[in-house]
Design a protein with these regions (language model features):
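A short alpha->beta transition loop at the rim of the catalytic pocket in nucleotide-sugar-dependent
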Residues: 510, 532
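Aromatic "clamp/platform" in nucleotide-sugar-dependent glycosyltransferases that forms part
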Residues: 517
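Short hydrophobic beta-strand element within catalytic cores of glycosyltransferases
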Residues: 534-537
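A short, active-site helix/loop in glycosyltransferases that binds the activated sugar's phosphate group
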Residues: 392-429
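Conserved donor-binding/catalytic core segment of Leloir-type glycosyltransferases
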Residues: 438-462, 468-473, 479
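Acceptor-binding helix/loop patch of EC 2.4 sugar-transfer enzymes
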Residues: 305-311, 362-398
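Conserved acidic donor-binding segment of nucleotide-sugar-dependent glycosyltransferases
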Residues: 549-558, 565-570
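N-terminal subdomain of nucleotide-sugar transferases
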Residues: 237-242, 250-301, 472
Length: 571
């Protein structure tokens, strides 16, 4: 039996007149609070983000679920998550100086639609009603609880008007907020830092600082339980004649796909997992905002201008990725709680707080940046004279943001064996799309000396230096595809020859070799395997053990030489 509906029958229904009186009182109290704050030189100020106390000890932590146990209207929870997401952007990472006052509303600002807030549940005059900014009390409850545990001074705090079963109000650990006259205000004689985060299921709050060791520690005292009071839910109370009654929301939660990199493996995953209500951007779905004609023209001009001003190519590329991330964020709606995202946009979305409260899978197109740079650093130690190995070095903050976002992801989708090994239980293995085999009739006949195809630009990170060292004393021909090249390559007795395309390289080769330090899309190796050619490659190429190929470790010249000799490929 619905206890909420039963309670509703024993209480008088709220009237429009009462709602008008409440609104007038609220605006009067808001004006009074504004006047008092204007006259108070010690009123709360907005506090900036900082990292001074990022490594300080945690004084208090709080953890609470985001989804109620018996939820009848998930759209209102989605609205609450959107409201928490917006508030976290103003709260996470702030640091408050000793003696400075913290005010919840001064820091967060008013919750309005224009500022990105949505309709969630709000407890007002005994009823749970849909309201803009509803659900922020879960954050104020957490902040009050953590503040008391951390030894902060509570300057202002208000209890909820009703006690919901199972809530912190039963233990007198709650703090309601209502713009702007019901506030939560804190201060402390020591500097303190606030960290707030949420994943798809839980809200977590942490307060850091260096409190005086002689100060009294505040474990939260166990207060007598306040009795729960009946509260009506406007979505399910069944009082249809009430002017507040809305009924359950008609919207449904859904998944959003953003296929920035149209790998065939990702397209196959979309075809297999696309739901009826899913929104898809990219191949098979809607056009990306950046594909609008005016955006294409603007991007081209921005690219040329950046290069003309001398900006490095990676910087220009990062600027474009930031723009794409803003496009994605602009398309997100509150019911989009399940996302499939490209790895390239992940750090920007994480930094902007758009992934908080959402479950997401990542389409992995490369190794994580921190791992990629470790691989390149290993190559630099072997070839310190090669400048191209130092090209890719991302900003430390960007690397950290990507790694944190990857750790919070539900799954990593990839066909790359190395990426899947790193993902562990998070990994979702996709099968490499095997290309059509080159026709045997077009293959060149064996020549007097072996022909090895190197299926990548002859750069140090692709292993060209190791290959040349392995065959230096052998009479072999190395076929190179079009593309950039290291300068001053010395093949020894071997010879280098350019071919017109990757296809021509496969048609003329006796074997394919790629001892790469880094390789994210081994399409040419897959083509060689499909054609039945012997393949020697490193695990960095991401080929699965189920395919026929010979592994060698990156940088292992002697191992490469043995593998080539075993396969009669010129080693």
């Amino acid at each position: 039996m619905n206890t909420v509906a039963t309670a509703a029958t024993t209480t008088d229904l709220p009237t429009r007149r009462e709602a008008l009186v409440f609104a007038c009182k609220a605006w009067g109290l808001r004006a009074l609070r504004a006047l008092r704050d204007a006259a108070d030189p010690g009123r709360p100020r907005r506090h900036p983000r900082a990292n001074t106390l990022a490594q300080a000890p945690a004084l208090a932590e709080f953890d609470s679920p985001l989804w109620p146990g018996e939820e009848v209207d998930p759209m209102l929870v989605a609205g609450k998550l959107q409201n928490l997401r917006q508030a976290l952007k103003r709260l996470d990472g702030i640091e408050v100086a000793p003696g400075a006052r913290f005010g919840f509303w001064k820091q967060v600002g008013r919750a309005t639609r224009r500022r990105g807030y949505a309709i969630g549940r709000e407890l007002r005059e005994g009823c749970l009603i849909p309201a803009i900014g509803g659900g922020l009390c879960q954050l104020s409850n957490a902040l009050y609880d953590g503040a008391v545990r951390a030894g902060l001074t509570v300057l202002e705090r208000h209890r909820h008007s009703r006690v919901l079963p199972g809530s912190l109000a039963e233990q007198d650990r709650d703090a309601t907020v209502f713009w702007n006259y019901l506030d939560l205000r804190l201060c402390a004689p020591f500097a303190w830092r606030l960290e707030v985060e949420m994943d798809a299921q839980r809200l977590r709050l942490r307060i850091r600082g260096h409190r005086d060791v002689d100060a009294v520690s505040w474990p939260m005292a166990v207060s007598p339980r306040r009795p729960a009071t009946p509260s009506n839910d406007c979505g399910s109370c069944g009082q249809y004649e009430c002017h507040r009654h809305t009924g359950p929301s008609t919207g449904r939660l859904r998944r959003l796909w953003w296929l920035q990199e149209a790998w065939p493996e990702f397209s196959a995953a979309l075809a297999a997992g696309r739901g009826e209500d899913d929104r898809v951007f990219g191949p098979g779905g809607r056009r990306f905002p950046a594909q609008a004609p005016w955006r294409r023209a603007a991007q081209s001009l921005s690219w040329r201008y950046g290069r003309w001003r001398g900006r490095a190519l990676p910087q220009v590329r990062l600027a474009q990725l930031r723009a794409h991330a803003r496009d994605l964020a602009g398309q997100l709606q509150l019911q989009d709680l399940d996302l499939v995202l490209p790895q390239s946009l992940l750090p920007f979305l994480w930094r902007d707080g758009e992934l908080a409260g959402r479950r997401y899978a990542v389409l992995m197109t490369a190794l994580p940046m921190r791992v990629l740079q470790d691989e390149l650093d290993a190559a630099v130690r072997r070839h310190p004279q090669v400048r191209s190995l130092r090209d890719f070095r991302a900003d430390e903050t960007l690397i950290a943001d990507e790694w944190q976002a990857l750790q919070a992801a539900e799954t990593w989708w990839s066909p790359h064996a190395r990426v899947l090994a790193m993902a562990g239980e998070r990994g979702r293995a996709l099968s490499w799309a095997m290309p059509a085999a080159v026709p045997a009739s077009g293959r060149a006949s064996a020549g007097a000396r072996p022909r090895l195809f190197f299926p990548a630009s002859p750069l140090a990170r692709k292993g060209i230096l190791e290959l040349l060292e392995a065959v230096r004393d052998r009479d072999v021909e190395i076929l190179l595809p079009p593309g950039d090249s290291e300068r001053g390559l010395d093949p020894g007795r071997a010879t280098l020859r350019r071919v017109d395309s990757y296809r021509h390289g496969l048609l003329q080769a006796d074997g394919v070799v790629l001892p790469a330090w880094v390789e994210h899309q081994p399409r040419a190796l897959l083509g060689a395997i499909a054609a039945g050619l012997p393949v020697v490659a490193t695990p960095a190429c991401g080929l699965p053990a189920s395919l026929p190929w010979t592994p060698v470790e990156a940088g292992d010249v002697e191992g490469l030489r043995r593998a080539l000799r075993t396969l009669s490929m010129g080693g």
